[in-house]
Structure formats: structure tokens, C-alpha cells
Amino acid sequence: MNKITSSNQYFFNFKRDLNASLDNFYFSKKNEILKNELGLFINDSNAHNLFISGDKGLGKTFLLNCALNHKKFSEQKCLYIDIENLSNNVKVFNEIDSFSVICIDNIHCSNKDIEVELFNLVNKAFTSKTKLLISSQLHITQLNLFPDLLSRIKQMSCFSIEQISDDEVDDVIDFMNTKLKLFFSKELI
């Protein structure tokens, strides 16, 4: 593990966006509930753990990084693990139950050994104050995981991130124009 911006934040060196912010994510109308739940996850110490599913490229990894980057967690021990890049290294799960927030990305890529370790981690999180945010390209009903692990994940608040609709494309362009300070005129867009 590598130290990052504070003595309390760690990550495994792959796919970690240290600048991700919820302010820079366009939440379509269909994703407003997810936006609200992420806000609760970050701001409410009693909030449920979250499972987010959705197709590749919809922003799941970005949202996990947004949560970890939030100022609310800046003084807490946080961890991001991308299962897709983990291979069979189950040793990474030793002593990670001391973290306040753990984001697990691409759980659909796990193998049986990792699933057993994830099951143990989820159990520890459920009995402690550790917050979990888990993502997958597969919907909860499509996951083929160790049954006990799947059962624990189903106890989490589960959401699917939805594709932006065609009628929201102009809003997305306006959003990006503002966020990136491009200042394109309406006529150009």
C-alpha cells in the first residue's frame, strides 16, 4: 500500500483518481436517488453500506473515488481496492478491518479465494462502524459469488447507475462547459 494525501488514506496503486469530486459528476434525473444515497453515505454515520452496479463507463469507479476524496473522510483511514487488478493476492485483506471507509471496485471480477476474504471483510464491517461502498458491472441478480458473500451484499442498499438519456445530452454539455470553464457559446453547442 502507498501513502497518499494524509497519514490516514491508503490505496493500492491502480485506478485511483485523487481529484474526483461529486461536484464534477453529472447526475441524470434517473440517478438522483443514487446522488442522495451517496450524500447520506458520506454525511450520515448511520447510513447503510452501498452497492452500485452499472455498465462499464458509467462512472462507478469515479463515484467510489469521489466518496473517498470527500473532505468528511480526510481525517479517517480510507481504502480503495480494485478487484480486477488484484490477481490472487489475498494478503491485501490482512489488517484492513481498521479502516473507516473501504471502497471495493469491480467485485464481479473476484475469484473464490478473494470472495472468502471479502466475505470476512464484509462481516467485520457489518459488526463495526466501517463503511463499505462496492461496485460491479453486473446487477446484484447477475452476480455469481460465494452464496454467503452475495447474501451479505444483498443486505446493503443496492442501486444501478443509469445511462444518460438522449434528451439530457444538452444538459451534460452545458454541465461540462461550466465545470471545465470552456465558455462555449450556446450557438456553438
Please tell me what each predicted stretch does:
Residues 69-81:
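Post-Walker A helix-loop "phosphate-sensing" segment adjacent to the P-loop in P-loop NTPases
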Residues 1-45:
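A short, basic N-terminal segment
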Residues 46-64:
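Walker A/P-loop nucleotide-binding motif
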Residues 53-54, 79-88:
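A short hydrophobic beta-strand->loop->alpha-helix junction that borders the nucleotide-binding pocket
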Residues 140-154:
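Short regulatory helix/loop adjacent to the ATP-binding pocket of P-loop NTPases
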Residues 83, 94-121, 128-139:
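Conserved P-loop NTPase "ATPase switch" module shared by AAA+ and STAND
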Residues 169-172, 184-189:
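Short conserved motifs of the RecA-like P-loop NTPase core
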Residues 142, 156-169:
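Conserved AAA+ ATPase "SRH/arginine-finger" region at the nucleotide-binding site
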